[in-house]
Amino acid sequence: MDGEADFMRRALELAEFGRGRVMPNLPVGCVLVRDGEIVAEGWHDHIGGLHAEQMAIAEAEVRGVPTLGTTAYITLEPCNHFGRTPPCTEALLWAGVSHVVIGAADPNPTVRGGGTETLRSGGVNVEEGLLVDECEEQMHEFMHWCRTRRPHVLLKAAIDAHGRIDGDPALPAERFSSEASLGLVHELRADSMAILVGINTVIRDNPSLTVRGPDIGPRDSPLRVVIDPNCRVPGDSVPMVYCAVATLMVHCTDLGAIDDVPHVVRMLL
């Protein structure tokens, strides 16, 4: 590799290893560089696990590679608060990293800039904005939330050659999806916080609405949400009897009777 952009691209590749496993956190990658060579790599692997910077520093320690004076290329501004793990800024300062190159600033306006300020106060040279578009694209769903305060919604539909989403309602439901498309569906589910369907889908297909295939680690499975205005959900349907994954049932027999319809709409959309 040669050039800063290549180091950041490698960090972006590493971040993808945490895709679907770190929710509600963001996928982050980090490489430590000395004399133009990567000496350690890290990524946020699973919820509650080491963050990317912490993993890279830990890898360097295991390999006996000194971190003092290294440069860290990180796809996202290092965190500066205690959560499930200590702050990444603290880890970088402890490791003696002298130069930090950040792809994207933290999109959360309540904490944005705190990480860079702490590092600079600790004597670290900080650069921002390297491959910022690519780094922001990697977390575009969260960027959408921070900018609009609305969830990022992905519509999925299995459609046959005639444009239908179902066959003859008098016959058992048919599956239009191929194995390849089903695999993609579960990858998308793994990268989501909720899976929403209408009551007719539950009655017709009796779906599990779970992630099957991708390893999402110890994070919570996506919440199952069923829009069932008139309480028609079958008591023996999978969303009702399979309790290993939480299900939110949305009932309302008369929307006109609700005093705060706009609030309900905001909560759903």
Role assignments for model-derived ranges:
Residues 28-36, 157-158:
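Short beta-strand scaffold segments in enzyme catalytic cores
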Residues 129-146:
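Short, structured interface segments
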Residues 144-146, 152-269:
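Active-site ligand-binding patch in enzyme domains
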Residues 32, 37-134, 253-255:
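Zn2+-dependent cytidine deaminase-like catalytic core
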Residues 3-23, 145:
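Short, basic/aromatic recognition patches
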Residues 5, 9, 21, 46, ...:
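Electropositive phosphate-/nucleotide-binding environments in soluble metabolic enzymes
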Residues 24-27, 152-153:
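Short, small/polar residue-rich loop motifs at catalytic or cofactor-binding pockets
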